[in-house]
Amino acid sequence: PYTTLFRSTSLLGASSAALLNALKELAHINDDIPLISPNIIEPIQKLKVNALGNHNPRLHTDEVLIALAISATTNPVSHHAYQMLDQLANCEAHSTVILSSVDANTFRKLHVHLTCEDKYQTKKLYHN
């Protein structure tokens, strides 16, 4: 029953933001409360770009779940959201663009039913 649009931010891809917001909704956590501190996200971004040579610093869904798991060890609010992962099973998600294989696979592993528009996020010939 929820319709929400998500766009990429400087820290997260749109799929990652949608995933965190779905967990917040399930856990009844106020939208203004961050589940993952930028102090956790930013070093991961630096690792992705500087050490691993990625061009996109934004966290994919699998990376944001790892960051959430780390946050959950010290933050009770993050822990509560993390415990909601099982509740995502059989939920439906729709993207207005074709997701990366990483994000699509993460939703599949979480048993989220995903549909996508027939449009790529970028104009690159290959889409990972």
Could you say what each language-model-derived stretch is?
Residues 8-11, 74:
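Generic alpha-helical structural element
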